[in-house]
């Protein structure tokens, strides 16, 4: 196995390139520990949307590579209460008066480990929220998040470990705004979902679930030309088991991108702007948009709590398969 890890500079910023004969990734720790590039080396296809300049990344950091959302998506008015404490997150979606996508996608993470093993190549990064004063004003907890990226054969494994090193419990959710290149004229998309959340004009769930009107096509592989998406789906895994995954089929390149998530990821947001930008974001979330303000069971919303001293790991993976035709 031709495993490799090297330090590089990416658009003027320190980065780590790692991979094998199948896959190559670039991780930029200072840019929210973003896997900014993922290349299938068999076909030389760039899988993720990359910025052309550092400025373009900083303008819209959640629309390149694999941004880490902690917590993911919107919190109405940036406000919620948990165990007697009221939290006020910054309003960074001013037109809808929401907090959007959490604290970590633009912060500098620390590199913990880079290593090669017989199993694959591993890059670990970590961020301690207690060291970020502007985060502590909003989320006054000693939370630590560690990302472990492993490339083994034709798969990138992403493991997110959330740790409570403080003295008080906190609610948490994590997700990824994974931004894949998606030429709509030659690509299809499938998702293991039968239901989606009804959203209001602020893109917040009303609490009502609806059947996906095109679910058969969604299961089999949809043509997304002329389809605009910013929708929140409940994974069908929650009710009937099976796989919990999104798949992109690049028909021209004869490859499939299989994006799997473990049982903690109960929801998927699918976003493609106006459908004409050449990208698609299948976003696995452990909690649904605005989960902290929904009067619904946590078993449905995905709202989880870490008590002092506890930690948990949420696992996902991206596998590239060749479609021989």
UniProtKB/Swiss-Prot annotation:
Induction: By nitrogen or tryptophan starvation. It catalyses: alpha-D-glucose = beta-D-glucose. One of its GO terms (biological process) is galactose catabolic process via UDP-galactose, Leloir pathway. GO terms for cellular component: cytoplasm. It is an enzyme of class 5 (isomerase). Keywords: Carbohydrate metabolism, Isomerase. Its EC number is 5.1.3.3. GO terms for molecular function: aldose 1-epimerase activity; carbohydrate binding. The keyword Isomerase applies. Signal peptide: none annotated. The keyword Isomerase applies. SUPFAM superfamilies: Galactose mutarotase-like (SSF74650). Pfam families: Aldose_epim (PF01263). The active site is at 177 (proton donor), 283 (proton acceptor). It comes from the Bacteria. Pathway: Carbohydrate metabolism; hexose metabolism. Gene3D superfamilies: 2.70.98.10. Substrate binds at residues 73-74, 230. Belongs to the aldose epimerase family. PANTHER family: ALDOSE-1-EPIMERASE, GALACTOSE MUTAROTASE. This is Aldose 1-epimerase. It comes from Bacillus subtilis (strain 168). The gene is galM.
């Amino acid at each position: 196995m031709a495993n490799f890890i090297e330090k590089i500079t990416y658009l003027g910023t320190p980065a780590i390139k790692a991979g094998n004969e199948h896959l190559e990734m670039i991780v930029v720790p200072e840019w929210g520990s973003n896997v900014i590039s993922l290349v299938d080396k068999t076909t030389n296809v760039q899988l993720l949307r990359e910025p052309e300049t550092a400025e373009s990344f900083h303008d819209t950091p959640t629309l390149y590579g694999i941004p880490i959302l902690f917590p993911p998506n919107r919190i109405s008015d940036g406000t919620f209460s948990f165990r007697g404490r009221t939290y006020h997150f910054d309003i960074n979606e001013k037109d809808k008066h929401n907090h959007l996508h959490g604290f970590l996608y633009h912060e500098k993470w620390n590199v913990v480990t880079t290593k090669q093993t017989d199993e694959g190549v591993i890059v670990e990064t970590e961020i301690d929220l207690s060291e970020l004063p502007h985060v502590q004003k909003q989320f006054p907890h000693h939370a630590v998040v560690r990302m472990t990226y492993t490339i083994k054969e034709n798969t990138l494994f992403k493991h997110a470990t959330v740790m409570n090193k403080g003295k008080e419990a906190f609610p948490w959710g994590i997700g990824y705004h994974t931004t894949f290149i998606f030429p709509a004229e030659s690509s299809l998309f499938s998702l293991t979902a039968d239901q989606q959340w009804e959203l209001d004009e602020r893109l917040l769930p009303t609490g009502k679930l609806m059947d996906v009107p095109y679910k058969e096509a969604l299961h089999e592989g949809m043509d997304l030309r002329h389809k605009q998406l910013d929708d929140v789906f409940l994974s069908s895994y929650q009710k009937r088991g099976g796989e919990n995954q999104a798949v992109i089929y690049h028909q021209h390149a004869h490859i499939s991108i299989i994006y799997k998530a473990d049982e903690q990821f109960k929801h998927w947001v699918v976003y493609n702007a106006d459908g004409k930008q050449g990208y698609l974001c299948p976003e696995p979330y452990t909690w649904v948009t605005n989960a902290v303000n929904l009067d619904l069971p946590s078993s449905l919303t995905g709202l989880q709590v870490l008590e002092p001293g506890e930690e948990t790991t949420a696992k996902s993976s991206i596998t590239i398969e060749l479609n021989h035709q």
